Amino acid sequence: MSKKTFEELFTELQHKAANGDPSTSRTAELVGKGVHAIGKKVVEEAAEVWMAAEYEGKDAAAEEISQLLYHVQVMMVARGISLDDVYAHL
């Protein structure tokens, strides 16, 4: 499995959202569906993080967290929110 930084993933998702084919790119598909659909995935993944952290092992929790981070970044791309916009609030 390839390892990416948070920043590398964000750059990749921006590219896929702008240039990807929704029939072959999950990112392009989600961005095309809009904020409501992405938001539903964020909520779903957040619940899965909680369940994995409480009832499963470290690896399962880490996998669910990675999926949550992906969907949060897709939301950022869809809304035109940059990493710097978020970092300004940390």
Swiss-Prot record:
Pathway: Amino-acid biosynthesis; L-histidine biosynthesis; L-histidine from 5-phospho-alpha-D-ribose 1-diphosphate: step 2/9. It is found in: Cytoplasm. Keywords: Amino-acid biosynthesis, ATP-binding, Cytoplasm, Histidine biosynthesis, Hydrolase, Nucleotide-binding. It catalyses: 1-(5-phospho-beta-D-ribosyl)-ATP + H2O = 1-(5-phospho-beta-D-ribosyl)-5'-AMP + diphosphate + H(+). It comes from the Bacteria. Gene3D superfamilies: MazG-like. One of its GO terms (cellular component) is cytoplasm. GO terms for molecular function: ATP binding; phosphoribosyl-ATP diphosphatase activity. The keyword ATP-binding applies. Its EC number is 3.6.1.31. It is an enzyme of class 3 (hydrolase). InterPro entries: HisE, PRib-ATP_PPHydrolase-like. GO terms for biological process: L-histidine biosynthetic process. PANTHER family: HISTIDINE BIOSYNTHESIS BIFUNCTIONAL PROTEIN (PTHR42945), HISTIDINE BIOSYNTHESIS BIFUNCTIONAL PROTEIN HIS7 (PTHR42945:SF1). Belongs to the PRA-PH family. This is Phosphoribosyl-ATP pyrophosphatase. It comes from Streptomyces avermitilis (strain ATCC 31267 / DSM 46492 / JCM 5070 / NBRC 14893 / NCIMB 12804 / NRRL 8165 / MA-4680).
